[in-house]
Amino acid sequence: AASDVYKRQMNDVLLPAKKGGYGVGFFNAVNVEMARAIIETAEELRAPVMVGTAEILLPAMELARVAEYLIPMAEKASVPVCVHYDHGLTFEKCMQALELGFTSIMYDCSTASYEENIEKVAEMVKICHAMGRTVEGELGHVGDNAGAGKLENPSDYFTDPETAADFVKRTGVDSLAVAVGNAHGDYAFPPKLDFERIRVIAEKTGIPLVLHGGSGLSDTDFKTAVKEGVAKVNIFTDIDKAGKRGIEAGLAAGEKSMMGLIPYEIDAMKEVVRDKILLFGSNGKA
């Protein structure tokens, strides 16, 4: 059913963010508690927000199940909530997400060769744009932290601004995930972001940029990245760990049931979402 959620496109939240110099948080929600923490906090702060899941997170909750709670919650929200499928690695799963009603797709072909990345992403853009949906691509490679700090020349994996301009022109993507010293998961070494690179990529591509591996970066890192052209910041590890801390707090307080633990879990996650939204500056923008 074509409903209001289809109007809540990635571009509807990211283009004003890019123009207004603030960032929009994208938070993965692998269960209803996470979804509630994200959406309720966004409503309280009057902030546009993006929610979804990633292919790598599907063991926690399969795509069709995620769609069952997430899309209706997004539709009923009093602020714009864009439902996004993150790090789609296979064409089939991306298609399933579109079929289920996700309004934007990140098709991650960043480990493929440059030409293959362009070819695959351009095809996804063609499909999504025909359906009135949006696409995020990735250029350069945002790895995980297991090996990130140990690379001989980490900048070999960084996004090149000239190449980024070519990639955007040839694929037609709506937003671009960049590799600028960021990595997924917990940082083994303090990350050093290349802000000048972000600024040049933003200038040359003209589209909203996306920062993956946001958990573990400093407040200053986020603020500067947003100032230089990042419009979407992905957060999962921080909110995931907060949920666990909330449960531990509930157990320590003597809670004896799953039901009793839920408010603790939600409150702990809401605190992280709140901090991030205020940090990115998207509060009051909805």
Labelled PLM ranges:
Residues 12-14, 30-52, 56, 64-77, ...:
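Alpha/beta enzyme core
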Residues 1-6:
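Short, small-residue-biased leader/transition segments that mark boundaries at the very start
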Residues 57-59, 112-114, 239-244:
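Short gly/pro/ser/thr-enriched loop/turn and capping motifs at secondary-structure boundaries
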Residues 29, 83-89, 208-219:
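Glycine-rich beta-to-alpha transition loops that act as phosphate-gripper elements at the mouths
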Residues 87-94, 138-154, 173-175, 254, ...:
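Electropositive, surface-exposed helix/loop patches at the edges of structured domains
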Residues 218-286:
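C-terminal alpha-helical cap/extension of soluble enzyme domains
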Residues 7-26:
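N-terminal amphipathic alpha-helix/helix-capping segment at the start of soluble metabolic enzymes
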